[in-house]
């Protein structure tokens, strides 16, 4: 996780730069009100930099204004704030991965299979990919863009796709398994591809397929995002057909580099490539 990687990177930076880095981590518990209160407490305690995985990406202005009033840089990550909010202050930043890229790479994984093993993928031979979609939490930017771009990638390549069903499984393996179980009962072998916004939901789909007695040869073509260890194991086993690596290590390293440079030097590190003076973009890998 990003939290674990941040703790690791902080220790490495302490040793490399002979300085003390204190990390204070709080859980907003999906409540923007609670998160705003936590930011207030951090500012009152005089922390040097605040990093925020914002609950509601449209509500960043409040936090940016609080940070500016206190003169404390704020780094958003994971959920990208609205651009206008980020530009309210020169020391508000975003570190993350373009969410649409993960969807594009998922689409390309399916396209590769369509080109190389079409007879296997196109079960009913109609020249159309029948798919189901397991989405993350409703309204989450990553979920919306991954969902949009995986399908637009197919369309841009001239491949027709038909959505049989979709459901918001909130990134959860258990919820995804329940949805997939229902779809298997309803659509059976007509499901050719399962797009999952993350690996946990992809694994939930695999769980449901296994419960239904399907082996890896008879399961749909299932793809996820994150390249988690359990997903990589499923990839080796052949039940998961593809995943996209979400660079938690690179995210943590970039956040820490930016936070330390802002704290020590008052400006972003020259080692970081800033886009529009606000954004540090990382990349997904399939």
Predicted regions and their residues:
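Extracytoplasmic "Venus flytrap"
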Residues: 1-18, 23-38, 45-47, 53-57, ...
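Short, solvent-exposed amphipathic alpha-helices that sit
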Residues: 2-16, 102-107, 141-160, 175, ...
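Hydrophobic alpha-helical
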Residues: 39-45, 49-69, 74, 145, ...
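Flexible loop/hinge segments that line or gate small-molecule binding clefts
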Residues: 63-101, 117-128, 228-236, 240
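Short beta-strand elements in bilobed, periplasmic/extracellular small-molecule ligand-binding domains
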Residues: 12-28, 130-133, 155-173
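Hinge/cleft segment of the Venus flytrap/periplasmic-binding protein
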Residues: 127-138, 250-286
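Hydrophobic alpha-helical segments within soluble ligand-binding/sensing domains
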Residues: 35, 94-126, 176-179, 227-231, ...
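Alpha-helix termini
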Residues: 11-18, 84, 113-126, 157, ...
């Amino acid at each position: 996780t990003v939290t674990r990687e941040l703790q690791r990177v902080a220790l490495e930076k302490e040793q490399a730069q002979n300085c003390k880095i204190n990390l204070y981590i709080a859980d907003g518990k999906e409540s923007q009100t609670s998160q705003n209160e936590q930011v207030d407490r951090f500012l009152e305690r005089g922390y040097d930099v605040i990093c925020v995985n914002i609950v509601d990406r449209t509500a960043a202005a409040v936090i940016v204004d609080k940070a500016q009033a206190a003169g404390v840089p704020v780094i958003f990550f994971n959920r990208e704030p609205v651009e206008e909010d980020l530009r309210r202050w020169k020391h508000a930043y975003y570190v993350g991965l373009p969410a649409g890229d993960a969807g594009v790479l998922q689409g390309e994984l399916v396209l590769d299979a369509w080109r190389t093993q079409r007879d296997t993928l196109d079960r009913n031979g109609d020249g159309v990919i029948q798919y189901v979609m397991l989405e993350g939490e409703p309204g989450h930017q990553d979920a919306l863009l991954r969902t949009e771009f995986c399908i637009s990638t197919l369309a841009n390549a001239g491949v027709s796709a038909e959505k049989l069903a979709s459901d918001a499984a909130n990134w959860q393996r258990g919820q995804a398994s329940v949805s997939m179980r229902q779809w298997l009962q309803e659509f059976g072998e007509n499901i050719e591809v399962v797009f999952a916004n993350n690996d946990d939901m992809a694994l939930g789909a695999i769980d449901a397929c296994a419960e239904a007695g399907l082996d890896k040869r008879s399961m749909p073509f299932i793809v996820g995002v994150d390249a988690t260890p359990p997903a990589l194991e499923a990839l080796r086993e052949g039940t998961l057909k593809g995943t996209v690596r979400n660079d938690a290590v690179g995210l943590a390293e970039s956040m820490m580099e930016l936070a330390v440079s802002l704290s020590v030097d008052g400006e972003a590190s020259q080692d970081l490539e800033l886009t529009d003076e606000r954004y540090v973009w990382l990349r997904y890998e399939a």
